[in-house]
UniProtKB/Swiss-Prot annotation:
Keyword annotations of the record: 4Fe-4S, ATP-binding, Bacteriochlorophyll biosynthesis, Chlorophyll biosynthesis, Iron, Iron-sulfur, Magnesium, Metal-binding, Nucleotide-binding, Oxidoreductase, Photosynthesis
Matching CDD domains: Bchl-like
Higher taxonomy: Bacteria, Bacillati, Bacillota, Clostridia, Eubacteriales
Pathway field: Porphyrin-containing compound metabolism; bacteriochlorophyll biosynthesis (light-independent)
Leader sequence residues: none
GO molecular function terms attached to this record: 4 iron, 4 sulfur cluster binding; ATP binding; metal ion binding; oxidoreductase activity, acting on iron-sulfur proteins as donors; oxidoreductase activity, acting on the CH-CH group of donors, iron-sulfur protein as acceptor
The organism's place on the tree of life at top rank: Bacteria
Residues that, per the record, bind [4Fe-4S] cluster: 95, 129
Protein name: Light-independent protochlorophyllide reductase iron-sulfur ATP-binding protein
Organism: Heliobacterium mobile (Heliobacillus mobilis)
Catalytic activity of the protein: chlorophyllide a + oxidized 2[4Fe-4S]-[ferredoxin] + 2 ADP + 2 phosphate = protochlorophyllide a + reduced 2[4Fe-4S]-[ferredoxin] + 2 ATP + 2 H2O
Binding annotation for Mg(2+): 14
Protein residues bound to ATP: 10-15, 39, 181-182
Amino acid sequence: MIIAVYGKGGVGKSTTTSNLAVAIAKEGKRVLQIGCDPKSDSTFTIAGKMIPTVVEILDKFNYHYESIEPGDLIFTGYGGVDVVETGGPPAGSGCGGYVVGETVKLLEKMDVMARYDVILFDVLGDVVCGGFATPLQYADLACVVSSNDFDALFAANRICESVVEKNMSGYDVKMAGVIGNRCDQVDLLETFTRRIETPLMGVVPRKEEIRQSRVKGYTLFELEEMGEPVQDMTAEFRKMARYLLSKPDGVIPNAVGTREMFELFKGEDMPWKGSNGKTGASTPSAQ
């Protein structure tokens, strides 16, 4: 099973994907996580370090693909999860999405994809261009990570539009659901997922332990083993892992038009707004 994980930059995709990968591995599955971001830090908490990227390895071997072995690309981290980082071109040049496609071709040529029960793509994706949409062509399911705010949900909707587009182009990828991350509330998330007719898979709260795990290079499951109070969060990831391993049919999301996105949440209770809907304004009194 191949799963592509998308979401707005900075929303916590990599932290979410890494903990999900470990949760799936703890269910006895062989897991590969492929980081698809030029920052190359998707797998940092699993590997505990920044691993060499595909771009760096290709350069090392002077782009002689036939000289590269799986062990040059694939590293094993916490929980037995294998990891790959695509890397990307220097800032301001080239196409990061192209590198993602080339990485998949290289792994297929090495015949390593079939070794795994679950492959997770962690993909850069605020507004999905053709290159970074490439994992959707291979994926069985897509997940979108979003916080409970408009900008993150706007990006999530654009990703849903990409899933719709891929289905129209003949690819059989479905949405597994939306994952709420860094959430103190879920009102906007619930409104959005109802509108796009897609499950809200799980909700991870905003907790200092998550931020610390990212900085220190640990997954939440490692922190749990160290005695940190993160059981509620690891339980949520285990729940989502079991949901994905149940092989849900998934859905083609009922993506919202761009203009409708700006109207969708107007009915939400926003007490900081005046009665005429403008921030800080008050209803004029009758003279």
